[in-house]
């Protein structure tokens, strides 16, 4: 039951890591679904069909990997000792799941046969230990492939010491090579909660081959102390092996020493896993055990496997080991969590610049919102508490001050102890705010006077309320008497302007003569957007009463306000809901920017005034074009004329970019005056009057030679002389 739970948890961890590597991990539901399919013994084709919706193009790759791991688990035995070792080697983050390793039970079994001899090193420089492993890449058919001659892979984790080493100690730095392919199935270690702690690896060189002693926290303790070991020491006084063991006893950390055995024995070793998938109650126990084991030390394994086909490399290492003499062994520290590698390809990863920009903008927005406290529409200055604005309240508090002075004893002493730092901090804040708001020096002196006046009062009451600086748009509360002598004169003005009620205090007012107290208004200084607090709204709505403009308000500092602003204030007090402010703003905008005339600018679109032009500039296209009857006076956009300035058509409906030169107007065509009467002129065709009102027929161009019988034009008739003219008479002669 325990072993099956552990194995199923490991498989689930590996599945989750693989999904994260493929970029398909969203939540815990997909690993749960895959575990159910594994428990139901789904085939690879069935898993590919079911998971294609979630994994897409990576489905075949994932199912091949998963079934390779499951086939590996089915092919091994169910020996409990080998189960735990194979569990470590298959699912550990430091070696791939398909590497050939050895179990810790077999390590202990062969420990007596090959006892390592402690050989110290006299070389002060740092060395790099060549840890050779036979790596296989998991394929669809689980075919094991060995690397080329001399190719050795190194462990993924970067090894660095857990403590400062003496100059005579050797530090072995084990880093991955660029050509390593051992990260295929190891990305799930990044999410493994058991890989959060570090392990200590001590290297002891034997007479013939180097062996690695690995310290782990198992269930039983190995008390073999024949070798000289350098362990992790949490206190500087514990420098010996005995002190390190005492520390292990106190902190309940148990270590186990494992050594490499002979290569012939290594070749015969096989580790097995037998998956057990039970009921839902067992799955619940898996989750509980997972939560419980997160607090346990990491169980990891560092394996060194020699490739015995290369005799030259072995002899070289033997010679190197033989040249090391001394009694100091090398201490290697392995950080359990490897450097995180991104599970997505670089093309699909989020842009880091966008993330950094979003973080910076979020921080800026947070700082901007926190600078304005809760009342975001007002700018606060920590100068003095708010004051009452009616003379009656002031006189009542001054009269009551004599009887209440004995009540201020211990608070004053406590405040005086912190007075220096508080005053200094308030002064700094005041200077910063004054410089930021660019307040007039006279107003700054006024604020300083008010600060001095209320120093004792703020200590007495421990009042944290702030002096309110307001824009004239809000309630401008104008202020108190310049002295008690002139107090009665300004009391009427205060009472007239006391529409804004201030929260009353029942604590003591100091017995001091009245000093000038002012409220500075920020005219033209921008204020952060926001709205009045609930307290301000209540005070404005409940305490507003119609205010009359006092005649004496222009005397003293009250006269600093512009008369127009005073009228605005009195009208605003009568209108607490803010509708007056909107009307005022609209009036100001009208005064500043006159309304445009509904007449098209004759210089558009070449008008140089732009938006400041008093005439209309068309924006949207005309829907009635080309049948628009307004032509160039239309308030909408017409297409440009291709003749532009050379266009001579006076009523051209197109838009002319350049100004047209006014051409000469065409001469009006005078139509011939119709005849006043259709009566034929009696003198025709001999009429010689040019303005003859009678009808004169038009002559035929062919005159007497016209042969058309139906010719409508006039043909002159040939006149025959009268008859008496044709009679010949013999002239009379005298005989």
From Swiss-Prot:
Residue segments, region Disordered: 79-141, 307-351, 366-388, 400-430
Pfam families, A to Z: zf-CCCH_2
Positions of post-translational N6-acetyllysine modification: 357
Originating gene: ZC3H14
Keyword Transferase annotated: no
Keywords: Acetylation, Differentiation, Isopeptide bond, Metal-binding, Nucleus, Phosphoprotein, Repeat, RNA-binding, Spermatogenesis, Ubl conjugation, Zinc, Zinc-finger
Record-level GO BP terms: mRNA stabilization; regulation of mRNA stability; spermatogenesis
The name this protein goes by in its record: Zinc finger CCCH domain-containing protein 14
ZnF (C3H1-type) intervals: 595-620, 621-640, 641-656, 681-698, 700-718
Oligomer status and interactors: Homodimer; facilitating circular RNAs (circRNAs) formation. Associates with the spliceosome. Interacts with HOOK2. Interacts with ZFC3H1 in a RNase-sensitive manner.
Lineage per the UniProt record: Eukaryota, Metazoa, Chordata, Craniata, Vertebrata
Segments of skewed composition (Basic and acidic residues): 412-426
